[in-house]
Amino acid sequence: MTIIVKKAWALSKGDKVAVVSLSGGMLGEDFCKHDIELGRKRLQEFGLEMVLMPNALKGIKYLKEHPEARASDLKAAFADCSIRGIICAIGGDDTYRLLPFLMNDAEFLKNVQENPKVFTGFSDSTVNHLMFYKLGLITYYGPNLINDLAELADEMLPYTKDAFKRYLEGGNIPAPIRSSDFWYEERTDFSPEAIGTNRIYHKEIHGYEWITCKSSFQGKLLGGCLDTLYDLLVKDGAEKEACNKYGLFPTEECWNGKILFIETSENHMKPEKLEKILLELDRRGVLEKINGMLVGKPQDEIFYEEYKSVYKKVLMKYPNLPVVYNVNFGHAYP
């Protein structure tokens, strides 16, 4: 099948948006019932209709044991022409297990090309984004349902809400993406009792930081969560085998002229592990080919300075590669 790069139309008021649990299944647990209603309410405020796919609420145990059910929901969403967007419920750690059920399904591959959708999610959804890149669909490493749309405060975080508006018709007007004035701590209480409470927040004192040279750069974005990339590229196991079998990671040529975006998860990987995955990306020719790099803010600013030191160390051999640190995307809030 000839792959043609496709970009979905922006979402319009009245559009249906599918919610899928492609990794972790917590959306189907009783302790997440309030997240469903909050997410539905927020989507309605954007003028969008939430469609829960058949297996999205089957819970952690069932979805862990049945990756084919998770894949089935994604296939059904692409087969349904009335669905215009797809939003991931949350991340996890085994999205790679869906690859055999998706990449070996000719009808799914055809639907991705013929029925492009706005697809958004982050973290372990990196696997989905890399898969869709291979299949020629432009996707968005952005908000998911539980973390962002179902924010327990009375409103979504303002910066995140503005970002989500860019998925809507008329919302994607070119404009500077500035550093958020504030950053927010991860919650420790996600229960219904926390509804209406605000996150602890701090004034942003760093803003965007240049790791290497300070110069303008441009290119198409490609990247994801470093924790997932580590499992796919460095750690020996089923994740790495699946990545190699399906050619998930882009070839060296694909990185030519790109902007690499990367960020770390809530697990706060040790700086030594960060260095390993960066060196692996370098070994694969990524750092030599790209035009620049965007690095996400570490959640809760844990290892903020240590990570910065690792980037400086690894990138010492690329003094002319512009790298911007502390960008608002991924696991940090906003």
Set out the residue ranges of the language-model regions.
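ATP/NTP phosphate-donor binding region
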Residues: 1-82
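C-terminal active-site/capping subdomain that shapes the small-molecule cofactor and substrate pocket
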Residues: 264, 268-334
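Short, acidic/small-residue loops that bind anionic groups at enzyme active sites
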Residues: 102-132, 138-146, 322
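Oxyanion-binding "anion nests"
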Residues: 221-271
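Charged helix-capping and loop-helix junction motifs
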Residues: 33-36, 67-71, 103-104, 274-280, ...
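Structural motif
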Residues: 87, 120, 259-263, 294
